[in-house]
């Protein structure tokens, strides 16, 4: 499997966060309607998805190219899901005093080779500028021509604005053309992604893509994996420890199936992006996780992305063992 870095530019607000598992579903719909995109139809691509995934999609992360300063572009990843005393080398008393301040630090700059996670500088979300907004809507009573009480009362819809450019990471099987994935992504960006795409939300532009290797520039002391999207760890992964924030995906079918008698999928409990997986024996892995089956009551073969691309990181595992 090859890995790619894709830079996109948000053009509107978003009703649905750009998470890897949801974006994977959008790409599947593009392949369903145009089998020439990847040279194979969707059913063929999903036939061995449990053992040989054709595509793995990461969540989106802030990307700043700093063209005016001629500096290298900076990618901001989510703070790892580890207890504070594993992320900050501070005395316990100071950790308690600064707990709120430290918890507000939500990102770090991804610049390989990464130092140990306890030596990274973490930044607050204010430094990244991702704005959450609300839009007031109302339903018009067709008899009175006005809003009213109950189901016709004004209501608030949350909206997310990505102020910076964004970067996505894709894992693509070697027999799959990356050009087809890029074209699918362009179509999604043109017509809109997620909730309220028909109202003009969720539009973006694909700016560039390039092949990358997460293991090309490392310190050789890495001992853990950082998940780039929500993941369901494989039971046979031989992990010594897994640290994560739980994320429940209340999924629903898209496209024409959104109007089916039962558009809702079964809930899936996942480890959110930023999860840290510590294997008993560290080895080079491009991705972790597994396919999620049985999520739909109307389509037996429906799958959900439980895979995640990973970045090698170094965790003070001796410190973790001493605290357990």
Regions found by a protein language model. Name each.
Residues 1-324:
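Conserved active-site/ligand-binding neighborhood in enzyme cores
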